[in-house]
Amino acid sequence: DRILTILTPLGQRSAIARGVRREKSRLAGGIELFAVSDVVLRRGKGSLYTITQARLDRFYRQILQDYDRLQFGYECIKLVERASRDVDIPEWFEVLSETLAGLGDVVSLQLVQVWFYLRYAELTGYELSLVNDVTGQPLDRQKRYMYDSIERGLRLSEQGELTADHIKFLRLAANKSLRLVA
């Protein structure tokens, strides 16, 4: 038997997969990391569900072939699992599904990372303001900015690396799906 944490469109669920370690288990093929599966859950005793059926929908095998994508995939799963314990909302499923799809479709890793972190920050309540700087002033197209990690926002700086083009891209990534941005 194996106890799993499953992220569903309805939120995070803990479930037990009985007999999944047996060689001829029907459930084993439908329960994979880096995959989206159709799973049938039956309410068990307490808060633990029982998995009665599992069928693999999409398996992102390409993630396993690139170490950097694999590591980032693990990091995303870990961050979303922790965050969804505190804020259990359906959006986590969408964010993680789209991130895995991007990692599996060989979209630029940096693009997937930027998109994921912007979504993650938004859902955890630390959304990056792309309208005002940390002092509350509107962002100016003619000026340069840097990210202030203490204030968690953009700060006006002559040596800043963020220009109007960067901010325009960040706005696009923050408001559109990863597929559209890619």
Where are the regions that the model predicts?
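Non-catalytic alpha-helical scaffolds and adjoining flexible linkers that form interface surfaces
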Residues: 1-3, 7-182
